[in-house]
Amino acid sequence: MFMSNKDKYDKIFMEVFEIAHNQLNKDLKYQSIEAWDSVGHMTLMAALEEEFDIQLEMDDIIDFGTYYTGIETLKKYSIDI
């Protein structure tokens, strides 16, 4: 089954943080949920790099602090969400 980049992005967030789709919103940010701690953050980064076949720069990893910021960050790597 075809999955859009948005579907893939959402699926990664839901799987890494074990959250429901309705929790993917403007309020979802680093440390706003228990699972998005430093370890969860690096797990998320690794999953995104693997899924989209990219290597995130350190500054992008540090600045990737919200669900929506991540969408903008991936645009730098030609990944349209």
Regions found by a protein language model. Give the residues of each.
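Phosphopantetheine-dependent thiolation modules in NRPS/PKS and related acyl-activating systems
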Residues: 2-36, 40-46, 50-81
